[in-house]
UniProtKB/Swiss-Prot annotation:
Family note: Belongs to the purine/pyrimidine phosphoribosyltransferase family. Xpt subfamily.
Lineage start: Bacteria, Bacillati, Bacillota, Bacilli, Bacillales
Gene Ontology molecular functions: xanthine phosphoribosyltransferase activity
Name the record gives this protein: Xanthine phosphoribosyltransferase
One Gene Ontology cellular component: cytoplasm
Pfam family, one: Pribosyltran
Enzyme class (EC, first level): transferase
Catalytic activity: XMP + diphosphate = xanthine + 5-phospho-alpha-D-ribose 1-diphosphate
Amino acid sequence: MKVLQEKILNEGKVLSGDVLKVDAFLNHQIDPVLMQEIGKEFAKRFKEENITKIVTIESSGIAPAVMAALELGVKVIFARKRKSLTLQDNMYVASVYSFTKQETNEISLSRNHIDESDRVLIIDDFLANGQAALGLMSLVEQAGASIAGIGIVIEKAFQDGGKKLREQGIRVESLAEIASLDNNAVTFVQQETAEVK
């Protein structure tokens, strides 16, 4: 997605060979116009999948998930990383290791909002080692719902998360795929796309 790649190049900051800071438009301050375009792109890519619900993880996945849900006309449920006083019982739970924060979180979804009738699109801001996506998949599978695919805003293609998911037969659609963050520079995977007529 060209507009996203331009935003990454202009406003993203490479902190190391593994870490890209995009807090200027995605995971702290949010650019709503960009999020709207991201939502439209996810909706376009998954429109034939009969999505009934979008699942994401708090907090950076919420904005792109909501915009995609708006385009698809479905609801969003986000996995919580912390226990809530209002959500104590009747939860699906999975453990997720955060590459960025270097910690393991228990994530949870209420059983009241997802079930076997749902066809789910998982959306997240980043895909690195795949732990968040695998945790979200576990929650969806615990509910008996089916997974239509995973939409990722930025994939670090030099890490193995995307490869692991695709090897499991999961459809992964990434809007920006980064080949490298070496030498303080973002290098994108060159994708050849065929026009569908």
